[in-house]
A protein has these predicted regions:
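Non-heme Fe(II)-dependent double-stranded beta-helix
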Residues: 2-11, 17-117
Length: 117
């Protein structure tokens, strides 16, 4: 996989198409949609939620848009956070060895728009 390291250095990001196989990402997507609907028993400090006075999921619970440290809670998230291809890509753009410091996921459900925040 080829990364545009120059773009990363100049703009602070680069696109890494095909970094993680789609099948692995679909497992994460399905789990995130389940989290969106309240399918968890995680501590609340793992989530950033939309204003509960305005937004509720289909079960009446809060609508999470951010998940902090999901790899601490479930293997499916650890598999991505510790994915060897992700580590290799980060080492390439950062020009040296890397260490996992944190992990997070963002959730974009159909009811979430730029007007939601």
């Amino acid at each position: 996989m080829q990364l545009d390291v120059q773009q990363y250095r100049e703009q602070g990001y680069t696109v890494a198409r095909g970094l993680i196989p789609t099948a692995e990402l679909l497992r994460i997507r399905m789990r995130l949609m389940d989290l969106l609907e309240g399918g968890h028993s995680w501590p609340p400090d793992h989530f950033q939620v939309l204003d509960p006075a305005r937004f509720r999921n289909s079960k009446g619970g809060p609508v999470p848009v951010g998940v902090q440290r999901p790899a601490r809670c479930e293997q499916v998230f650890r598999d991505i956070a510790e994915h060897p291809r992700l580590e290799q890509a980060m080492a390439q753009v950062l020009d040296g060895p890397v260490e996992l410091f944190t992990d997070q996921a963002l959730i974009k459900g159909p009811q979430i728009s730029g007007q939601s925040f």
